[in-house]
Amino acid sequence: GLVGTLLGHIGKAILS
């Protein structure tokens, strides 16, 4: 869903 994608992008940014 939209929220899942948003969290995925945020998590990826933190992980980078």
From Swiss-Prot:
Modified residues (Serine amide): 16
Top-rank lineage group of the source organism: Eukaryota
A biological-process GO annotation: defense response to bacterium
Keywords from the UniProt entry: Amidation, Amphibian defense peptide, Antibiotic, Antimicrobial, Immunity, Innate immunity
Family: Belongs to the frog skin active peptide (FSAP) family. Frenatin subfamily.
Primary role: Antimicrobial peptide with potent activity against Gram-negative bacteria. In vitro, is cytotoxic to non-small cell lung adenocarcinoma A549 cells. Also, stimulates production of some pro-inflammatory cytokines (IL-1beta, and IL-23, but not TNF-alpha) by mouse peritoneal macrophages and down-regulates production of the anti-inflammatory cytokine IL-10 by lipopolysaccharide (LPS)-stimulated cells. Very weakly stimulates insulin release. Has a very weak activity in hemolysis.
Protein name: Frenatin 2.2S
Organism field: Sphaenorhynchus lacteus
Top-level taxonomy: Eukaryota, Metazoa, Chordata, Craniata, Vertebrata
